[in-house]
């Protein structure tokens, strides 16, 4: 390797020598030494390059530690910035802070003017409660609604009568309460009223107009007396008179029992409970009557009106149970062709084995016999003599109405 390089060095030396000669330099011993040194210049340059590279590597090897230190320093700065940003984020805008500061200043001045410590404590507690209450206030629309209601209430209070008028009303209420306290108990008042009502109805059915008029006048006077309600002893006296009058009326001849309605010589009972058609027939038979059989247009109009007023569907004694399409009454009589006009439009239609007739709205309807409905019983009214003795004699025994 050294042998191959020596010719190149020699050639470089010869070339340099020729160039120097061309420039007027003379060849001397020193001159030859300089040429030799220059022949070794490439090697020196290589050594310098290696030296610089080694130094550079050493410096680069030191960079990671400095970079790591710089990074940790940057992290610390970043953390400080983050904390500062969070603290700044909690602050309100400057104007808001100024407003709060001013309010605090005013509050401090006001507190300085407060009375003794106990009073300050009381005010502080009230402020705390007020603050809590304000925090619980609803949204603005709800507040507006409450405000309007308060305004209306204030206006209503403003319309109240003056204090003296209120006092007068209060005294009047007190006197009324005392008067009510002197009345007999409610059950007895109710009993008196019911007996008056029943007596009035019974008197309305009595024969002989002159006798009815006398009793009716007596009842009117008694009713007026009860309406005035004098002291308790007087009320007791009236109650005893009513009891005696009721006993006298019970001995009178009445064409129909209590709770029955008289019409054209017959008595009718309108039930207050419901049964199927067959049980309704039985209920009427048990009181000496029958499920109503209609004999005239007047009777039909009377019964239809009673049913419509009470808004009830009520059984009548009509069915086609024996033969489909052939309607007959419970007394065995067939339905008169002239009565077919009382059927509601489209009836009877026998939808689902509807074999029994009822009062429905303004006419008749056929329905299933096993359905529970109200019912109407009918029987003849009792006859009464116009003779005074007969008039005051006990009436013939009459069955009680069927259980309603």
Swiss-Prot record:
Domain C-type lectin: 263-378
Biological process terms in GO annotation: adaptive immune response; cell adhesion; endocytosis; innate immune response
Pfam family of the protein (one): Lectin_C
TM annotation in the entry: 38-58
Topology, Extracellular side: 59-404
Keyword Transmembrane helix: yes
Sequence repeats: 96-118, 119-141, 142-164, 165-187, 188-210, 211-233, 234-257
Cytoplasmic membrane side: 1-37
GO cellular component, one term: membrane
Keyword terms: Adaptive immunity, Calcium, Cell adhesion, Disulfide bond, Endocytosis, Glycoprotein, Immunity, Innate immunity, Lectin, Mannose-binding, Membrane, Metal-binding, Receptor, Repeat, Signal-anchor, Transmembrane, Transmembrane helix
Protein's membrane topology: Single-pass type II membrane protein
Coiled-coil intervals, chain numbering: none
Record-annotated disulphide pairs: 256-267, 284-377, 356-369
Subunit structure: Homotetramer. Interacts with C1QBP; the interaction is indicative for a C1q:C1QBP:CD209 signaling complex. Interacts with ICAM2 and ICAM3 by binding to mannose-like carbohydrates. Interacts (via C-type lectin domain) with CEACAM1 (via Lewis X moieties); this interaction is regulated by the glycosylation pattern of CEACAM1 on cell types and regulates contact between dendritic cells and neutrophils.
PANTHER family on file: MANNOSE, PHOSPHOLIPASE, LECTIN RECEPTOR RELATED (PTHR22803)
Protein purpose: Pathogen-recognition receptor expressed on the surface of immature dendritic cells (DCs) and involved in initiation of primary immune response. Thought to mediate the endocytosis of pathogens which are subsequently degraded in lysosomal compartments. The receptor returns to the cell membrane surface and the pathogen-derived antigens are presented to resting T-cells via MHC class II proteins to initiate the adaptive immune response. Probably recognizes in a calcium-dependent manner high mannose N-linked oligosaccharides in a variety of pathogen antigens.
Annotated protein name in UniProt: CD209 antigen
Underlying gene: CD209
């Amino acid at each position: 390797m050294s042998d191959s390089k020596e010719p190149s060095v020699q050639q470089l030396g010869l070339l340099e020598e020729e160039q120097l000669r061309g420039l007027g330099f003379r060849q001397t011993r020193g001159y030859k030494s300089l040429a030799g040194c220059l022949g070794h210049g490439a090697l020196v340059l290589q050594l310098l390059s290696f030296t610089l590279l080694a130094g550079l590597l050493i410096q680069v090897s030191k960079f990671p530690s400095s970079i790591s230190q710089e990074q940790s320093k940057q992290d610390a700065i970043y953390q400080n910035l983050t904390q500062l940003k969070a603290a700044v984020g909690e602050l309100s805008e400057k104007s808001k802070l100024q407003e709060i500061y001013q309010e605090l200043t005013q509050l401090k001045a006001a507190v300085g003017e407060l009375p003794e410590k106990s009073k300050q404590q009381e005010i502080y507690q009230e402020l705390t409660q007020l603050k809590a209450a304000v925090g619980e206030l609803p949204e603005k629309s709800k507040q507006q609604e409450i405000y309007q209601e308060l305004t209306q209430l204030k206006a209503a209070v403003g319309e109240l009568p003056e204090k003296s008028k209120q006092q007068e009303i209060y005294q009047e209420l007190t006197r009324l309460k005392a008067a009510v306290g002197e009345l007999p108990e409610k059950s007895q008042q109710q009993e008196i009223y019911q007996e008056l009502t029943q007596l009035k109805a019974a008197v309305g059915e009595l024969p002989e107009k002159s006798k009815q008029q006398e009793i009716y006048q007596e009842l009117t006077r008694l009713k007026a007396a009860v309406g005035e309600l004098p002291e308790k002893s007087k009320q007791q006296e009236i109650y005893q008179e009513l009891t005696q009058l009721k006993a006298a009326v019970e001995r009178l001849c009445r064409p129909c029992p209590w709770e029955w309605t008289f019409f054209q010589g017959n008595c009718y009972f309108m039930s207050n409970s419901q049964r199927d058609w067959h049980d309704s027939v039985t209920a009427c038979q048990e009181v000496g009557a029958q499920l109503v059989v209609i004999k005239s247009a007047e009777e039909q109009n009377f019964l239809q009106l009673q049913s419509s007023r009470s808004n009830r569907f009520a059984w009548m004694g009509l069915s086609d149970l024996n033969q489909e399409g052939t309607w007959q009454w419970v007394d065995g009589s067939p339905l008169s062709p002239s009565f077919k006009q009382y059927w509601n439009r489209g009836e009877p239609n026998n939808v689902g084995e509807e074999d029994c007739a009822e009062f429905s709205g303004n006419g008749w309807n056929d329905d299933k016999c096993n359905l529970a409905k109200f019912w109407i019983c009918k029987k003849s009214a009792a006859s009464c003599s116009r003779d005074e003795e007969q008039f005051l004699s006990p009436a013939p025994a009459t069955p009680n109405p069927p259980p309603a």
